[in-house]
């Protein structure tokens, strides 16, 4: 359903959060108008009806329906503006059932702007929470007055988002990387900090929060920029598609899910090794992409090279979806990585199917996860168009996901946006959440059995369970195990956190593969190029030296030797050749950056002048505009001078050319019989003057002239040095 043009916030919003009312339908805004669209479900199929405009303001950033109490109770709608929030009451007229009566009940303002997702209603009471970056205000009598109270924030950090738990007993506020928990006292009308868990740090900057079931919330954390730079994603490797990894030759596995408790002890298995006993913590979905086992020698190497992770880019870290349960005396969490989305600031949860949708206002992908008892496997990925962004998510049923899509205009990525909002073409899209019953039953069934019988499982049973997980889907051994038994889409497998810089001719360089085996025998080798790549990108690979014959071998090495290798055998290359190959590729990389700098300079000219200088605008050779530069000897001004003719560039002369031509670092130019000025350069290196064609100018060394200025005779017959102006 097309909604037309609208101006929405760029990031941090879920425009469909608390946006659907059972009676009045969908509330949405184009940035100025408040619009209600009828929405009905016929046999679980959504049907959109007529739309009416009930208000128009200068700025509307969000709309939130209050809890549905009864059919005869007027509905409450919170309208979020820039620095204030108004609450409106809607009901149909008793005399005319088709006439909608709208009246304002209360309003709250703040010196600070309201956060993008700045309002959240209590699930069962007329209590509204308004958020700014510094304050949490609770309006507990929205139908009658503007009475409110502010939470006692024990932190100097910035507030980002908040939500009520599903049971309504707790308000969870996200401040930085910590969750601040508050208990609402309905009798005293107070908000008190939780006694057993007032603050719970989850170790990542929180983007969004959503209540799930009972006292549990789902939290998404972003991948910070400093972590992206620390991942060395630019020198990670890409495994060939034919290199299938089996369980028999893996030195270690990393559990996808991590569990934490209030004591701060990490319960999940370490990435360095995995014993069968550690499966009791999380016997469910395994992340088979983090299989590299580094030794201490690898950590001390000059280049710490890693295998490319098809899901997160480098195999080290990613944004995360975290489940936090606030129980009576303990707080526990479980987490799963979110591939391909750096800032997941949109969350939506369906309580019937126990599934959560994750998206970002800056990414065109939507991921759907299933909240099972012991794991959070990725079950579906929805891919939008390249210039489309999800601006809101909401589950209509357990199988229908409503997506508010904003289509952006093509913008110049070289410049950061100056405004917090942008114009979009808005439309509503309904996507069906697909379930593969056979694979879901097998995967989900195994998960439930593992969760319930985990304490009584033997070591042998755990081994069989892990082997069965690998055998179910051979094509996903190096990727995330999906309940449907299929590999993640190509978008997720090849998504990179840091895109490689390509030259403008569009050619692609050949790529090589990385295979990591025994950590003590890995060595770095630079593959030589068969052809010269135009973009001068570097291709790296790891190869294994030939192992010496020994009397005894470990079971791990026997498994590795028994399996046929799926990689290119290294050739005998001397260390000198390797060093030469490395130096050549470094030179190619520097060449690539030089070309990039040249293109950036051209882009700067285009943005400043509004057009690209075309060769068609050049003058013929016979009409070449040039100036004759006469370099005068500072010691002997009347002596012979050096002359050079220099071509003008749009009547401009480049200072560096003159300096290099005459070997002068500081130059003076003669403007009159006794006036000399020292030349400087602008941001582009040109002398900030225009010259005429066939003009002759006189210059000299300014340093020598300053030490030995030529003398002249004034009116009083006294000797005075000639003037010099800078």
From Swiss-Prot:
The record's section on InterPro entries has: WDCP
- Keywords attached to this entry: Coiled coil, Repeat, WD repeat
Q: Where is the composition biased (Basic and acidic residues)?
A: 517-533
Q: Is Repeat among this UniProt entry's keywords? A: yes
Task: Report which superkingdom the organism of origin falls in.
Answer: Eukaryota
Q: Where is the composition biased (Polar residues)?
A: 506-515, 550-574
Q: Which Pfam families match?
A: WDCP
- Give GO MF terms, alphabetically: kinase binding
Ranges for the region named Disordered are 502-574
According to the record, where are the WD repeats? 55-98, 154-194
Q: What does the record list as coiled-coil region(s)?
A: 581-609
PANTHER family tied to this protein = WD REPEAT AND COILED-COIL-CONTAINING PROTEIN
Name of protein:
WD repeat and coiled-coil-containing protein
- Protein species of origin: Xenopus laevis (African clawed frog)
Gene name, Swiss-Prot/TrEMBL? wdcp
């Amino acid at each position: 359903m097309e909604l037309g043009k609208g101006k929405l916030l760029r990031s941090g919003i879920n425009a469909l959060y608390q946006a659907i009312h059972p009676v009045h339908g969908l509330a949405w805004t184009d940035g100025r108008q408040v619009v209600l669209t009828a929405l009905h479900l016929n046999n679980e199929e959504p049907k959109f009806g007529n739309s009416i405009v009930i208000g128009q303001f200068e700025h509307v950033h969000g709309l939130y329906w209050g809890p549905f109490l009864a059919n005869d109770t007027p509905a409450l709608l919170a309208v979020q503006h820039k620095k204030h929030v108004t609450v409106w009451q809607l009901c149909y007229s008793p005399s005319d059932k088709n006439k909608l009566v709208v009246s304002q009940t209360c309003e709250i303002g703040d010196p600070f702007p309201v956060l993008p997702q700045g309002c959240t209603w209590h699930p069962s009471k007329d209590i509204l929470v308004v958020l700014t970056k510094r304050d949490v205000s609770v309006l507990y009598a929205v139908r009658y007055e503007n009475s409110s109270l502010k939470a006692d924030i024990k932190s100097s950090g910035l507030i980002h988002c908040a939500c009520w738990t599903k049971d309504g007993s707790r308000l969870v506020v996200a401040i930085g990387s910590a969750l601040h928990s508050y208990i609402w006292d309905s009798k005293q009308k107070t908000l008190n900090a939780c006694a057993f868990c007032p603050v719970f740090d989850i170790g990542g900057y929180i983007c969004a929060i959503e209540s799930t079931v009972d006292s549990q919330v789902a939290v998404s954390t972003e991948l910070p920029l400093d972590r992206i730079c620390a991942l060395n994603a630019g020198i990670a490797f890409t495994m060939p598609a034919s290199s299938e990894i089996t369980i028999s030759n893996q030195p270690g596995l990393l559990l996808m899910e991590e569990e934490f408790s209030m004591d701060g002890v990490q319960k999940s298995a370490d990435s360095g090794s995995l014993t069968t006993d550690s499966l009791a913590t999380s016997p469910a979905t395994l992340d088979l992409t983090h299989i590299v086992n580094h030794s201490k020698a690898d950590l001390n190497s000059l280049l710490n090279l890693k295998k490319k992770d098809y899901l997160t880019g480098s195999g080290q870290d990613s944004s995360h979806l975290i489940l936090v349960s606030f129980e009576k005396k303990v707080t526990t969490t479980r987490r799963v990585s979110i591939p391909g989305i750096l800032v997941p600031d949109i969350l939506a949860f369906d309580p019937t199917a126990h599934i959560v949708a994750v998206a970002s206002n800056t990414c065109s992908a939507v991921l759907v996860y299933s909240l099972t008892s012991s794991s959070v496997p990725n079950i579906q990925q929805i891919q939008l168009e390249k210039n489309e962004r999800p601006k809101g998510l909401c589950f209509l049923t357990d199988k229908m996901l409503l997506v508010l899509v904003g289509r952006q205009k093509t913008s110049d990525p070289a410049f950061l946006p100056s405004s917090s909002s942008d114009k979009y073409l808005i439309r509503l899209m309904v996507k069906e959440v697909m379930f593969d019953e056979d694979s879901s039953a097998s995967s989900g069934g195994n998960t439930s059995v593992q969760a319930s019988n985990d304490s009584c499982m033997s070591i042998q049973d755990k081994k069989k369970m892990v082997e069965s997980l690998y055998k179910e889907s051979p094509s996903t051994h190096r990727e995330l195990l999906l309940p449907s038994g299929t590999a993640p889409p190509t978008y997720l497998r090849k998504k990179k956190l840091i895109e490689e810089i390509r030259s403008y001719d569009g050619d692609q360089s050949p790529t090589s593969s990385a295979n990591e085996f025994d950590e003590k025998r890995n060595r770095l080798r630079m593959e030589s190029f068969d052809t010269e790549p135009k973009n001068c990108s570097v291709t790296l690979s790891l190869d294994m030296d030939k192992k010496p014959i020994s009397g005894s071998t470990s079971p791990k090495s026997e498994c590795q030797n028994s399996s046929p290798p799926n990689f290119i055998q290294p050739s005998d290359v001397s260390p000198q050749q390797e060093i030469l190959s490395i130096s050549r590729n470094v030179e190619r990389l520097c060449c690539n950056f030089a070309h990039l700098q040249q293109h950036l300079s051209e882009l700067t000219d285009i943005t400043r002048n509004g057009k690209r200088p075309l060769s068609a605008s050049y003058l013929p050779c016979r009409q070449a505009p040039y100036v004759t530069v006469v370099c005068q000897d500072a010691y002997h001004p009347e002596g012979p001078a050096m002359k050079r003719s220099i071509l003008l560039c749009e009547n401009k002369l480049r200072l560096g050319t003159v300096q290099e031509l005459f070997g002068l670092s500081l130059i003076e130019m003669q403007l009159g019989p006794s006036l000399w000025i020292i030349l400087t350069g602008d941001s582009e290196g040109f002398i900030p003057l225009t010259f005429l064609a066939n003009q002759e100018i006189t210059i000299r060394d300014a340093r020598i002239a300053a030490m030995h200025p030529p003398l002249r005779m004034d009116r009083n017959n006294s000797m005075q040095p000639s003037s010099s102006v800078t």
